[in-house]
């Protein structure tokens, strides 16, 4: 049986720079008011709450939310984690012990270009799997989230074939982002359908035909079709909504409220 839940990914606010770092009560209030049931902050957005999990629990209780996932983004450019990268991974794994049902999302920071592509892909996979092994040992479910900037080593279909053929699905899942898939020139429905058995976490954001970020429902991605597909595949997990449009960068709260309207009208009736 499918149990799909919808939450807010913090990148909508992260685009504003340092303005919203640590503003968990504010973002949670906006997310809850918009009709979302969870949040997904990246570690860099937690601010003082990263040292005080009890305080985060209080915020979640106040706004009737769950922390559906926490995202960790690092370079992972070498054949193994650097000491600093391993420290960051251990920190988030220790933090997640306080939130036993929360998913860990791993996302690689893009480089300046795609030089030495095969080696960089192999290095990234090695680092991701090293973290995933430790995560699995702790009972923490995790997935890898590819992105689409020009310097990403997992951004086009050929990259996805490499990634999803090599990743050990016993310890790490696939966290597809509909917007990044489209921006990488791929068929979003095809990717979700082909790899649906590997999917443990999902990101939604919309994009136009000219590959400009857009509000939910204002672009080309057929979100209702994806939700229906994942429901029928008995997906039990989160779909985190974010927006990277210029409008969202200026006013993430308003963008989230509008995306909540789309959620209530077009997606919630499907699950």
Language-model regions, residue ranges each:
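A cross-family glycoside hydrolase active-site/sugar-binding cleft signature
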Residues: 7-11, 40-42, 68-73, 105-108, ...
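Structural motif corresponding to the early beta-alpha repeats
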Residues: 25, 37, 41-131, 136, ...
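Hydrophobic, aromatic-enriched interface-forming segments
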Residues: 138-156, 160
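Short helix-to-loop capping/linker segments positioned immediately adjacent to catalytic or ligand/cofactor-binding
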Residues: 132-133, 147, 190
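Histidine-acidic metal/acid-base catalytic patches
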Residues: 1-35, 61, 90-94, 100-101, ...
């Amino acid at each position: 049986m499918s149990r799909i839940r919808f939450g807010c990914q913090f990148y909508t606010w992260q685009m504003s720079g340092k303005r919203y770092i640590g503003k968990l009560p504010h973002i949670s209030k906006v997310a809850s008011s918009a009709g979302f049931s969870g949040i997904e902050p990246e570690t860099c957005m937690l601010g003082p709450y990263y040292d005080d999990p009890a305080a985060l629990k209080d915020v979640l209780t106040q706004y009737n939310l769950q922390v559906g996932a926490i995202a960790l983004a690092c370079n992972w450019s070498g054949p193994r984690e650097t000491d600093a990268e391993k420290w960051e991974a251990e920190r988030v794994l220790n933090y997640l012990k306080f939130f036993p049902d929360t998913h860990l999302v791993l996302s690689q920071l893009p480089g300046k270009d795609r030089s030495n592509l095969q080696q960089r892909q192999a290095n990234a996979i090695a680092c991701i799997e090293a973290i995933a092994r430790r995560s699995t040992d702790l009972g923490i479910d995790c997935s890898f989230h590819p992105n689409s900037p020009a310097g990403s080593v997992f951004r086009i279909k050929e990259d996805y074939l490499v990634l999803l053929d090599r990743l050990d699905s016993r310890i790490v899942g696939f966290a597809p982002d509909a917007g990044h898939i489209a921006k990488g020139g791929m068929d979003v429905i095809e990717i979700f359908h082909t790899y649906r058995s590997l999917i443990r976490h999902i990101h939604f954001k919309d994009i136009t035909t000219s590959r400009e970020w857009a509000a939910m429902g204002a672009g080309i991605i057929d979100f209702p079709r994806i939700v229906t597909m994942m429901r029928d595949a008995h997906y039990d997990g989160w779909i985190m909504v974010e927006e990277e449009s210029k409008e969202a960068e200026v006013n993430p709260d308003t963008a989230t409220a509008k995306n909540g309207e789309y959620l209530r009208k077009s997606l919630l009736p499907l699950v």
